[in-house]
Amino acid sequence: MSLVMNGINPDAKRHPDDFYVTEPRAVIELMEALGDLNIGLPPLVVDSSVGSGVIPDAVQLYGHDAIGYDVEDRGWAGTRLQDFLTVKAPDLPQNFAIIQNPPFRLALDFIRHGLDLLPDGGVLCSFERISFLEGACRRDFFDRTPPAYVMPFTRRVKCAVDGSAVKAGSAICFAWFVWIKGRAERPQIVWLD
């Protein structure tokens, strides 16, 4: 019972690729918050695990171009079939931001690699469970490379398994973790609706 109360269903099957579709509202809330904080994004946004294209579709509403990487074609027209962890800096233009919902089990690898690819001052936003704050290995990473902002949602965000329709609410809390490469101050909390 305690597992269920903590938002974990021990009977639930995880998607083998950790493919959970981001609710569009989550991306819109992020874009609005970045605007409110005067965090300007460059013209190009990269999604490291594009899936069905929810993140690029949303950022395009704000006038940005987008490219997306994935290990499988899940229907977004601009998908580049390549594991993001193998992308090299010369594969990308000089000025871009990263907005992603990576596989949870590989999230730290995706964040580290993304930060390595970004120029100083570059922005990386990663959609994660709030429990991403926990764990000794992530604590060490956060101590050395703190996010500029942690943006938790006050209303639960629903993530669809494999793009399926979400029928019920979620017991899992999510947040955007936002890095500005080179910034080392303590993170600020920005509440999202």
Residue ranges and their predicted role:
Residues M1-D193:
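Class I S-adenosyl-L-methionine-dependent methyltransferase catalytic core
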